[in-house]
UniProtKB/Swiss-Prot annotation:
Disulfide bonds join C86-C97, C108-C125. Pfam families: Cathelicidins. The lineage of its organism: Eukaryota, Metazoa, Chordata, Craniata, Vertebrata. Keywords: Antibiotic, Antimicrobial, Disulfide bond, Secreted, Signal. One of its GO terms (cellular component) is extracellular space. This is Cathelin-related peptide SC5. Residues 30-131 form a propeptide.
Length: 160
């Protein structure tokens, strides 16, 4: 009788330990890695984009040092994406697309959560400052040539 109780008690403990192990395993399986969370955010950005081509992760800054391992708390991210040759309407995953030669580059910053269920992210992407400055300068030069070009040509003809 005593051995039956001990055996039954051991069986219950084993069952509880097994259940606890399953719960912990499923909880840890739901947490994404930092890189996986960023890739998911890039996919969401591509879905919401109105641009012609997909963007793909080019470079990911290292994750910040944080003591908090809670996957529901937003983590700061910083990364760069580059335009690919794949049209946005294609069903091909961006990670399988080649980068477009001279494709547009964007710097992205924001937050992601590592919770696999959630898909929570807040990301803003923009062209790097130097590229924007060069484009702006190019537009100003083109505008100046358009506006003052004929006058400059007349002066050159008169002087020459």
């Amino acid at each position: 009788m005593e051995t039956q109780r001990a055996s039954l008690s051991l069986g219950r403990r084993s069952l509880w330990l097994l259940l606890l192990g399953l719960v912990l395993a499923s909880a840890s399986a739901q947490a994404l890695s930092y890189r996986e969370a960023v890739l998911r955010a890039v996919d969401q950005l591509n879905e919401k984009s109105s641009e012609a081509n997909l963007y793909r992760l080019l470079e990911l800054d290292p994750p910040p040092k944080q003591d908090d391992e809670n996957s529901n708390i937003p983590k700061p991210v910083s990364f760069r994406v580059k335009e690919t040759v794949c049209p946005r309407t294609s069903q091909q995953p961006a990670e399988q697309c080649d980068f477009k030669e001279n494709g547009l580059l964007k710097e992205c910053v924001g937050t992601v959560t590592l919770d696999q269920v959630g898909n929570n992210f807040d990301i803003t992407c923009a062209e790097p400052q130097s590229v924007r400055g060069l484009r702006r300068l190019g537009r100003k030069i083109a505008h100046g040539v358009k506006k003052y070009g004929p006058t400059v040509l007349r002066i050159i003809r008169i002087a020459g």
